[in-house]
Amino acid sequence: MDYLSHNVSENLKRIRQSKGMSLDQVAEQTGVSKSMLAQIEKGTANPSLGVLGKITSGLRIEFQ
């Protein structure tokens, strides 16, 4: 896992847990599949900018 993937993975998991949300809830709120979210959190998938946009918009967080 490269540096960027690791950061995205760790941040998504941290934010999801801090909001007390399950992967199912995040999937419903963002429009990104549960399996894709799980792969991102595990670092086995690199999300496109479009997917990152859906996640940040759905979770109401800033993309930096």
Locate the predicted segments by residue.
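Short alpha-helical DNA-recognition segment
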Residues: 20-38
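A short, Lys/Arg-rich alpha-helix, primarily the initiator
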Residues: 1-18
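Short alpha-helical elements of helix-turn-helix
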Residues: 10, 49-52
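Hydrophobic micro-packing sites on short alpha-helices
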Residues: 16, 26, 51-59, 64
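Key DNA-contact positions within bacterial/archaeal DNA-binding proteins
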Residues: 24, 35-36, 45, 50, ...
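Intrinsically disordered, low-complexity segments
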Residues: 16, 31-33, 46
